[in-house]
Amino acid sequence: MAEATQKVSIVTPERVIYGDEARFVHVRGTDGDLGFLPGHTPLISSLRPGLLRIQKEGQWSTFVVAGGFVEVRDSRVVVLANAAERPEEIDLARAEKAKERAEKRLAAKDPEIDVVRAKAALARAVARIEAAGQIKR
């Protein structure tokens, strides 16, 4: 018997980065990690920057999302991401520099610094480094 699947889409303002059937989707919601199998209860959640993983036919695909929203209903998972990329698209050196910059901003404790923005930049950089490391091994 074939495994049940659900339609999964990852959409950014620039492109559709993924659109296919999948068995399982894992995202990082703002209130914690979420996993979706076919037939999941309808849900809408905001996403924090981090890894998004999709399982199809026993194989995992990883993406980095820079926040956004996920909607689950009628055996469909739609991710509307501010930005998203595949690990092979990531410039690891650039991500490491972005992480250093964000850490310096946060450590400076300058009242002029937008702390929320700096924390989001740090989370994005860490997720990009983590994803890039998965393909560099």
From Swiss-Prot:
It is a peripheral membrane protein. Keywords: ATP synthesis, Cell membrane, CF(1), Hydrogen ion transport, Ion transport, Membrane, Transport. Transmembrane segments: none annotated. It holds the Pfam family ATP-synt_DE. GO terms for molecular function: ATP binding; proton-transporting ATP synthase activity, rotational mechanism. Its main location: membrane. F-type ATPases have 2 components, CF(1) - the catalytic core - and CF(0) - the membrane proton channel. CF(1) has five subunits: alpha(3), beta(3), gamma(1), delta(1), epsilon(1). CF(0) has three main subunits: a, b and c. HAMAP family: ATP_synth_epsil_bac. This is ATP synthase epsilon chain. It comes from Desulforudis audaxviator (strain MP104C).
